Amino acid sequence: MAPFPEEVDVFTAPHWRMKQLVGLYCDKLSKTNFSNNNDFRALLQSLYATFKEFKMHEQIENEYIIGLLQQRSQTIYNVHSDNKLSEMLSLFEKGLKNVKNEYEQLNYAKQLKERLEAFTRDFLPHMKEEEEVFQPMLMEYFTYEELKDIKKKVIAQHCSQKDTAELLRGLSLWNHAEERQKFFKYSVDEKSDKEAEVSEHSTGITHLPPEVMLSIFSYLNPQELCRCSQVSMKWSQLTKTGSLWKHLYPVHWARGDWYSGPATELDTEPDDEWVKNRKDESRAFHEWDEDADIDESEESAEESIAISIAQMEKRLLHGLIHNVLPYVGTSVKTLVLAYSSAVSSKMVRQILELCPNLEHLDLTQTDISDSAFDSWSWLGCCQSLRHLDLSGCEKITDVALEKISRALGILTSHQSGFLKTSTSKITSTAWKNKDITMQSTKQYACLHDLTNKGIGEEIDNEHPWTKPVSSENFTSPYVWMLDAEDLADIEDTVEWRHRNVESLCVMETASNFSCSTSGCFSKDIVGLRTSVCWQQHCASPAFAYCGHSFCCTGTALRTMSSLPESSAMCRKAARTRLPRGKDLIYFGSEKSDQETGRVLLFLSLSGCYQITDHGLRVLTLGGGLPYLEHLNLSGCLTITGAGLQDLVSACPSLNDEYFYYCDNINGPHADTASGCQNLQCGFRACCRSGE
């Protein structure tokens, strides 16, 4: 059917808006975490506003279209009598008023999804019927000029509620002191008494739908967002939307620079004056005595300013950790704390635990230690990380690199599914790389079998880089399978051995696997936990290959365009494909062509002089760093050429132009690498300092 002339098509334009709203609430419904009270209430408030607009739309159609058509045709009935909009609005009000805890939220969510799906199934065909049935009838019973007039009135009525010009006028009025005074002058009690009257006459910014408000908020900086969060409860919830807090720069914010876009100029070092000012601030802050009197301290004006800035930075960091990141942490992609005067290892540890999806982390020249990465002690808990800068972090040792490598996860296999193994030694610091095969005689065991059989003998990790692993001393491990839809509380697991849990099974795996040489290890994998990191990344895939020069027999891995097959390096047992199933951890997923772990592109350990060869080799575990292009090891005084060679062999994408290490080390690609960057540097470790 040919489309009707735009001038007399009374349904298409309003229906476009209604269909857009349907798409928006379907998308929000699929992304809402119903266990989170803030997400739950934000969804209901958005749905309530959406369905109020649906009701307004149908009231306009009844008055200006259907009502007129009924006057000229006796065959037209009340087409909006069974739309159930009032029932849906009552459902949302009930959820906002009566649902009090997580259990009730989850039960309500099931009912909500069913009701929304039923409504959507009816609402979309209803609009199609109006366009295909009633529009031709309008063309039959009304003249061209009459239809033009009807459409003009319909559009005008819709715009009287959500007209862009009116909204812009509301935004303009919002900036006037007179309107602000009018908004704030009423007390809470007076507001509640006059709420109905105000809502009837107001068409300002408070009536904007949430998606429009989020679009407006996206243009604001963090300081402005914090101010907006104090306007109302609705705005407070909207300003805690994750998309508004993707990039964090607390150090710059504390100094008045409120930039919050993507990280830029990644390789550019600040000038000497900027670094000196940051060091002066840090020194003044750490030497400052909080109990000292003004007369006693006798600080200069410059020192007072430095202390004030450092104090501001500390307060800002505490505010982020306690008031912002618990809500938006999973959405944070960039965190830059370079040259921070006040950040501590504890703060970094808390931030990293709340931000499992970080892609860019810059801790340049901060006073952190290995403990800052304690929250990264779990396999794959930050496997999206692409940029890590620890330049000048002099307290960092191999321990931190072990945690970092573990957090990057395990390289995904592109050809077959793998099953993760675990042993009883959870505190092990080395990874033992072993592929596993399924036993065909016994695949599943109930929970009580776990208490009757040993998990496996403890594997010696004292010399993990020189001692080959023998399969003779390794018994069959168990892999715990948890139903992701029925996770138990961690405290409940204490009683698991005393009762039967139907949703938990253990899978027994074979133990006849070994590597032809030393250097292939895998990390103990512990069970699922309630942490955000575990819930998102516990299903990291198995090793794709070891990536060490020990097992590569001199092969120049970094010159290859693709990663070699594991069979080319190690004699391993044949892998057994696992069937797809919701109770199995299956790694041959639909997204197997895209790596989900070990995607690091940039790594700088410049000035981390306590790093040794062991730390470099730890980075080669789990498949190495196949995407790494930039590696800065300037000032790492104790590493050797052998350790560098082992790391380089696991970094096939490394660019010599961005490969830096000490000039005194006879390492790989000595003729093409860029050498040391810390020569004559006043604030980074270097073997030639003082020359």
Curated annotation (Swiss-Prot):
UniProt effect for mutating residue 687 to S: More than 90% loss of binding to IREB2/IRP2
Further remark: Binds a diiron center, that can be bridged by a hydroxo group. The hydroxo bridge is not present when FBXL5 is in the reduced form and seems to play a critical role in regulating iron binding.
Domain text: The hemerythrin-like region acts as an oxygen and iron sensor by binding oxygen through a diiron metal-center. In absence of oxygen and iron, the protein is ubiquitinated and degraded.
InterPro entries: F-box-like_dom_sf (IPR036047), F-box_dom (IPR001810), Hemerythrin-like (IPR012312), Hr_FBXL5 (IPR045808), Leu-rich_rpt (IPR001611), Leu-rich_rpt_Cys-con_subtyp (IPR006553), LRR_dom_sf (IPR032675)
Residue ranges occupied by any F-box domain in the UniProt entry: 202-248
Cell compartment(s), UniProt: Cytoplasm, Perinuclear region; Nucleus
Cofactor(s) needed: [2Fe-2S] cluster
Organism of this sequence: Homo sapiens
Subunit structure as annotated in this protein's UniProt entry: Part of a SCF (SKP1-cullin-F-box) protein ligase complex. Interacts with ACO1/IRP1, IREB2/IRP2; the interaction depends on the [2Fe-2S] cluster. Interacts with DCTN1/p150-glued.
Lineage of origin: Eukaryota, Metazoa, Chordata, Craniata, Vertebrata
GO biological process, one term: intracellular iron ion homeostasis
UniProt name for this protein: F-box/LRR-repeat protein 5
Annotated spans, Hemerythrin-like: 1-159
Domain of life: Eukaryota
